[in-house]
Amino acid sequence: MEPRWQRIILTAACIATLALTGLFLTRLTESPLSSLTARDRSFLRIWAVNAPGGGQAWLKAQLRTFEKQHPGVSTYLRTVSATELTTSETILPDVVLYMPGDVTEPSALFLPLTGDMAARDGLLREELLRCGRWQNQQYGLPLCWGAWILAIDSALEPGSATTPAPTTLLGRPAATLDASSTPEPDYPLEAARQADCALQSPGGTALFTLSLLLEEQPPLPAAFATLSSGEVYAAFQRRQCVTAMLTTGQAIAFAGLTSGGSGFPHRIMTADEVITDQVWLASVTADAPPEAALLLSFLASAEAQKALSAQGLHTVRDDLTLYASGISARVESAAHRALSAINAYLPAETVQSAAWQFFHGQITLNEALLPLM
């Protein structure tokens, strides 16, 4: 039998441990931000399921700024798979960041957003807010977006291809002459027809932009519209196809490689309007503390949104214009004319079917897009 003094010490230790655990949970879920100090910390657990190119770098920088402005809050960022997020045994974090196609049942994971979370001072673009809306409830707050462009290898048209501008130390494309008013050359159809692989593209939303750019299709490979975005990018980088649909993040990354001597000269084509699924959204879960809403509001603020330009990403705010030249300026200008964002919670098969039918001229653009909004 244990001596009486050992039992007393063990009991006291258990009581102290339970008290500390209860104190931590209370502070995590109940303490208002105004009462937090450096000694009373609130922890925000953030999961990123997916991100546009440059999104993680922007987010990490903004989280550091957010913590400096709110000394009582610490953030913890983790990258997870969509499967891990939706597994029934998963203990959900406080905030989840994701892209269209990652989540199909938002009501099972997230709380509807209200107040500043749903619309930051009424300055968020409605087209992007609709992307995070499901059954008339706003579940996802758009944080930034990218688009789809068509990249064309210089091997097809050496005289027209250009080497992208050098990048700065931060990775942002350096300033170039504004070409937004200069008509883009047409797609080099005849030259593409002579290539072993004329064109590659992912399926789904990329096909909408591709259809707007092509007056006539070149010969399509057997794997057309079946590869992932990353696989298409790799094929273009290895010169296994002479033209390819890339995300703007991929296009900016490849421009950096080219200016550094690792890529090759090429040009890009942008459509006169933007149809995209490259939207980064944030949602809060049921047990999230009040600081989660504060973080979302901060990420949609003008201060945080202006910093998107360092990564070639686009703002979700109506009152900001970030670019004067280059790829990003062309895309931003097109979005001011017309912007459509595919609903985030639709099954990928639904988007693929509509885009494929439009690509082959079986339905009109309006018929394809309206069910996807």
Where are these regions (language model features)?
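Short helices/loops that flank or line small-molecule/ion binding pockets
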Residues: 83-96, 103, 229-244, 357-360
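C-terminal capping/gating helix-and-loop segments adjacent to ligand/active sites or protein-protein/ligand interfaces
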Residues: 2, 6-7, 309-373
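Extracytoplasmic/periplasmic substrate-binding proteins
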Residues: 215-288
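Bilobed periplasmic-binding protein/Venus flytrap-like ligand-binding cleft at the lobe interface
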Residues: 280-315
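Extracytoplasmic/periplasmic solute-binding protein
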Residues: 139-144, 148, 161-218, 241
